Amino acid sequence: NKELAISMGVEEFESLRNKIGEDLIVTDGTTLLGADDKAGIAEILTMAEIILKENRPHGNIRIAFTPDEEVGRGPDHFDVEKFHADFAYTVDGGEVDSVDYENFNAADANIQIQGLSIHPGSAKGKMINALHVAMEFHSMLPVNQNPAYTEGYEGFNHLCDLHGECEHAVMSYIIRNHDEQLFEKQKEDFRRIADYLNQKYPKDTIRLEIKDSYANMRSIIEKDMRVVDLVKKSMKDIGIHPSSHAIRGGTDGARLTYQGLPCPNLGTGGYNFHGKYEYASIQEMEKSVELLLKIVENNLS
């Protein structure tokens, strides 16, 4: 977008180095694209269209689209028994050469802070500024667990929202880690800080609520890797060198896996999700469709 001086290059987005010669779908730079996950929907429906038009042989295929995946509520009302499948895949990732079955353990933390508002002219020894307490709470969390400093298998505590005034403030965090023990330690850090501040200030200054969202599906999938092996064989059959990565996020498949439906995640050819630099490669989207068709074919044998 020349008017707004918005552009993207390989210096900031390394994935572009591998997209030379490909056709990219982008935005005007003022909004996200929505390839996450309209790309996956398009690929699944294109697969179904080809199977029906060409009358290709196939086993029983179940297709479902879940709303609210981005807020972690996609499987809330998903009926696994009614879906009636032995295994499944979410088509919700990035690189098409990746089949991912390892994701974050996830929790949400909500912190209510009750302050005491006094006229600042006579506040000495009396005022408790809830916003100051919020900043104090945040400063006591490990600095190296700020998401801006993490990568790979490193977990993080992300402050998503802070609002309020002197009398009352609210903080919202997401807590993430692939390792279950480290994940539990991060949650314990929140409880320990809340206990400390409730001793420093009047009781119930801090009210902390932590809710688990989803868990790492790796331990379940690794008990029976056939669902992954099928994808890797299909990738090789169409000339893709398969890879697997630890997802620095979550998918509906993680919760579905724990509900008895093994569900790794496949790539869509979309990149830079959740921001105005999001884009999708048409060639990778076409390759994703080819992969889905090959999975259907190989599953028959």
Residue positions per predicted region:
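Short helix-loop-beta-strand segments that form the rim/entrance of peptidase-like active sites
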Residues: E49-V71, E151-G152
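His/Asp/Glu-rich mid-to-C-terminal helical/loop segments that flank catalytic regions of hydrolases
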Residues: K53, I128-P147, Q181-I193, D229, ...
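Short pre-catalytic strand/loop immediately N-terminal to key active-site residues, enriched for Gly-Thr
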Residues: V26-A35, I240-H245, G275-K276
